[in-house]
A protein has these predicted regions:
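Helix-loop boundary and gating motifs at the non-cytosolic
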Residues: 6-52, 209-219
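Central cavity-lining transmembrane alpha-helices of secondary-active solute carriers
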Residues: 46-64, 230-241
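Conserved MFS/SLC helix-loop-helix module at the cytosolic interface between two early adjacent transmembrane helices
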Residues: 57-88
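Intracellular juxtamembrane helix-capping segments at the cytosolic ends
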Residues: 109-122, 284-299
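Glycine-rich segments within core transmembrane alpha-helices of 12-TM secondary carriers
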Residues: 125-147, 306-322
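Symmetry-related core transmembrane helices of the 12-TM Major Facilitator Superfamily/SLC fold
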Residues: 153-172, 331-349
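Extracytoplasmic gate region of multi-pass secondary transporters
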Residues: 192-236
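C-terminal transmembrane helical hairpin of 12-TM major facilitator-type secondary transporters
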Residues: 253-289
Length: 376
């Protein structure tokens, strides 16, 4: 308990909580928009697919921009875009294609701003960014519930504006050194013996699997609003615990905990809520691990590193829009195989727990040679 208390009192941990609220409100706004829009649309399945593509994929590019211009408080621009999208769609009845573009870019900006702020102010710890990311899960279900009730647009806009003081307060934690390229050099979680390019590919693959399983996990028990709320709450708790426990007991232990122990609960929890929720919580922990690995490889580009995780989430969730596996035996087989593969990958690409003295690869100019995206 003393170690847990120590982690929860880590330097600048408040930044994680501040951006958890900002992330929560961001997802409330986005899923309020999506739920309202899809309820009135004849192309209901297209809109979430378009949203996922536009909200997830560009985050790497925006992240790279923020890496270059780290002093720019881009989150305030994101708030303005989210508010504009809501007013365009539900106040001015504009074309949804235009408003969803504005909404998604605003969403991208808010995510990248949170990642940049929590990573740069964490001194190599994972709890800060894990707490920030966890806030979004609570926002998803809250936004859906608000869209199903009678809530005036002005109240939703007011909720959006409450993010501004939190953004300004989070920004006060920045010191001059946190804006520099060296801010994330304390992230040393990746295996130094494996090529950085290969680590990025493998870590992104693990994120793809997590993205798929987030939609593909059999949860036939999930029939009521209360059960849906519990599912998203447990997802959020799992994401936060992944970072907190990694700082407490070590990232390799959490890697095994979050993948191997999740298997029986995910496989046999289809009709039993509590068993399923335990599995969901365990596997959600991998978020912090993969982010920590990617930032270790790209310490001078934390925004870009975060972007790889969101691209992975999109690639993992996209197949669900086109193919749905009905046979639970096939689903369970996939869960077992993919979980074991992810365990093997994580243990290979993670560095040794006590090998923190050396850096992995601090001259990351190799990146443009692989991806041709070091464009600024």
């Amino acid at each position: 308990m003393s170690k847990l208390a120590e982690v929860l009192k880590e330097k600048n941990i408040a930044v994680g909580w501040l951006y958890a609220y900002i992330h929560f409100i961001t997802e409330v706004l986005c899923f309020y928009y999506l739920t309202k829009l899809t309820n009135d649309s004849a192309i209901i399945w297209v809109i979430p697919l378009v949203y996922d593509a536009l909200a997830f994929v560009p985050q790497g590019l925006i992240g790279r921009f923020c890496d270059k211009f780290s002093r720019l408080n881009i989150a305030l621009i994101g708030v303005a875009m989210l508010v504009a999208a809501l007013i365009m769609q539900f106040g001015l009845n504009s074309n949804w294609i235009l408003s969803i573009w504005v909404l998604c870019i605003g969403n991208c900006i808010m995510h990248v701003a949170g990642a940049e702020c929590t990573l740069r102010n964490s001194e190599g710890k994972l709890a800060h960014s894990a707490i920030f990311v966890a806030g979004g899960s609570f926002g998803v279900i809250t936004g859906r519930l608000l869209a199903s009730s009678i809530v005036p647009l002005w109240l939703i806009v007011l909720m959006a504006l409450t993010m501004i003081p939190f953004i300004l307060l989070a920004n006060t934690y920045y010191k001059d050194e946190n804006y520099k390229e060296t801010a994330c050099l304390n992230f040393n979680y990746a295996n130094k013996k494996i090529a950085p390019f290969l680590i990025i590919v493998l870590a992104t693959f693990v994120v793809i699997v997590r993205g798929y399983m987030g939609y593909g996990i059999p949860t036939s028990w999930n029939k009521t609003t209360t059960q849906a709320v519990l599912l998203y709450v447990i997802m959020g708790v799992g994401k936060a615990l992944g970072g907190i426990l990694s700082d407490c007991i070590g990232i390799r232990k959490v890697a095994v905990l979050s993948t191997v122990l999740a298997i029986p609960f995910l496989c046999f929890g289809d009709n039993i809520m509590i068993i399923s929720l335990i599995g969901v919580m365990f596997f959600s922990m991998t978020m912090a691990i993969t982010l920590g690995i990617l930032v270790s490889v790209l310490p001078k580009k934390p925004g870009l590193a975060f972007g790889f995780t969101t691209i992975g989430l999109f690639l993992g969730s996209a197949p669900i829009f086109f193919v749905k596996i009905i046979d639970n035996r096939i689903n369970i087989g996939l869960i077992v195989i993919m979980s074991l593969v992810c365990t093997f990958i994580l243990l290979k690409i993670l560095g040794k727990e006590h090998d923190k003295s050396k850096t992995l690869e601090r001259d990351d100019n190799w990146l443009w040679k692989c991806f041709l995206i070091d464009f600024i």
